[in-house]
Design a protein with these regions (language model features):
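Tryptophan-rich aromatic "cage" segments
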Residues: 268-295
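Short helix-initiation/N-cap motifs at beta->coil->alpha
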Residues: 36-48, 100, 138-171, 258, ...
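Internal, conserved structured core segments that host functional sites
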Residues: 111-132, 142-155, 161-162, 167-180
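Immediate post-signal peptide segment of exported/extracytoplasmic ligand-binding proteins
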Residues: 1-10, 99-109, 272, 277-280
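Secondary-structure boundary elements
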Residues: 98-103, 129-137, 168-174, 226
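Short, glycine-/small- and polar/acidic-enriched structural segments
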Residues: 10-133, 143
Length: 295
């Protein structure tokens, strides 16, 4: 059996249940060393990854990755989502200011950190397709630009002044609602814009049979082309690490075909919301090496 020198890769990866055994040393490799040199909060490294190629491997938000692929950035994904969740609960409003149904945000201002944020794309898609919201009639107020510099936000997207706090503006009524995800205030006045979001998410899952992907693992395209054995080894490590994680009902599966429907939906909603210049195919998200992983 041929032996290969150990390859060290600059890696940006957070501590997820599926990656923790890689991070804490329970899963190792004689072929590849992952140098976890990214920021403590991994998403703070996404801009550097797609703009400056700051890392060789690691996680990217799925919408950031789809954009990166659409604009020819040198990364390719493994069919290994490292996180996923239902998104119905991720948009809220202050119910003390009056009732608000999903359609009521038309003609109003809604806050989101960036227009192309993965949570924002999933939530807007749910609002459009499940509740009939015309997204073009909403003014989206943002704090930051996209991770990918090529994206031009649509005309109904306006930047807030520096230092603005979405949660505070939602609570005061300056914003009708805000997409905040895990940063939603733990305040009894906050109510989900989607009624009974847990039940809505369960009904959606029973119908669609997919869990929205949040972050995926990617590697440099050059690595996949020149050293496919290293990429296969990384996938093996992720699979082994995932085996240490407790069972979860909100974890996307591994493998291209198992994720095809979810990836297609992410592409479709990205295109509908004008965060990518064209509708990619699912197969364009992979190369020959990564498409075969888990097959």
């Amino acid at each position: 059996m041929a032996s290969f020198p150990v390859v060290t890769l600059k890696t940006n990866l957070a501590d997820y249940p599926v990656t923790l055994a890689m991070k804490d040393g329970r899963v190792t490799s004689s072929l590849v060393k992952l140098d976890y040199c990214g920021p403590k909060v991994a998403n703070k490294g996404f801009k550097d990854m797609v703009r400056q190629n700051a890392y060789d491997a690691g996680e990217l938000a799925i919408i950031t990755y789809i954009q990166a692929r659409a604009w020819g950035k040198p990364f390719v994904m493994l069919p290994a989502p490292v996180s996923g969740r239902f998104q119905h609960h991720c948009i809220g409003f202050n119910h003390e200011l009056g009732p608000l149904a999903p359609k009521d945000i038309e003609g109003r201002e809604v806050g989101v950190r960036t227009y192309s944020q993965t949570t924002g794309v999933w939530v807007r898609g749910i609002l459009q397709h499940e509740y009939g919201v015309n997204l073009d009639k909403v003014t989206w107020r943002t704090l930051e630009d996209a991770h990918v510099t090529e994206l031009q936000d649509p005309p109904n997207c306006k930047r807030l002044p520096a230092g603005s706090k979405l949660a505070d503006m939602m609570m005061s009524g300056e914003l009708a609602a805000a997409i905040l995800g895990g940063d939603m205030p733990k305040d009894p006045r906050v109510q989900s814009l989607v009624p009974d979001p847990a039940a809505a998410a369960q009904a959606w899952y029973e119908r669609e049979q997919l869990i929205p992907i949040n972050h995926v693992f990617v590697v440099r395209q050059e690595l996949s082309k020149q050293q496919p054995e290293v990429v296969r080894e990384i996938y093996r490590m992720i699979v082994e690490s995932r085996g240490f994680a407790p069972e979860s009902t909100t974890r996307p599966p591994f493998g291209l075909e198992a994720n095809r429907k979810g990836l297609q939906l992410a592409i479709d909603w990205s295109f509908e919301q004008k965060v990518i210049p064209r509708r990619l195919s699912v197969d364009e998200l992979f190369d020959d090496t990564t498409a075969a992983l888990g097959a």
